[in-house]
């Protein structure tokens, strides 16, 4: 298996509906250790390229007949900076009205329930070799998430606009 030597900048990814998110590190049935991580869907050409250079990509069958298969990458979110080798990730949340907030270890959990409009991220590889097995795991370097406009806010604005038109 080739070892990955460069950071890969991924754009135009989907971490919305149907993807796994655990930025808060909550212990679950399928995540007994409470590992902070999330998954992203990748375009086929990006997924196959990353797989070719050593990344582990999950191939998901089509959800419905006629759909394309999906390619999923799990990304770790680590705040463990004991060795000083890697700084903690930079995570920003942009709201639909343009406000931007930086999220930290104790606030990143809000992304677990955020309705995501768009996301851009940078990941770094971590090449591992344990008990004769080797691979490459993706870790988050930087993430900017744009939240979808909440329906309540949209409905309130529409009502306000209608009231202004009536005046």
Task: For each feature predicted by the language model, list its residue ranges.
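Intrinsic disorder/low-complexity segments enriched in polar/small residues
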Residues: 9-12, 100, 106, 121, ...
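Exposed beta-sheet edge/beta-hairpin loop segments within beta-rich domains
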Residues: 94-119, 126-136
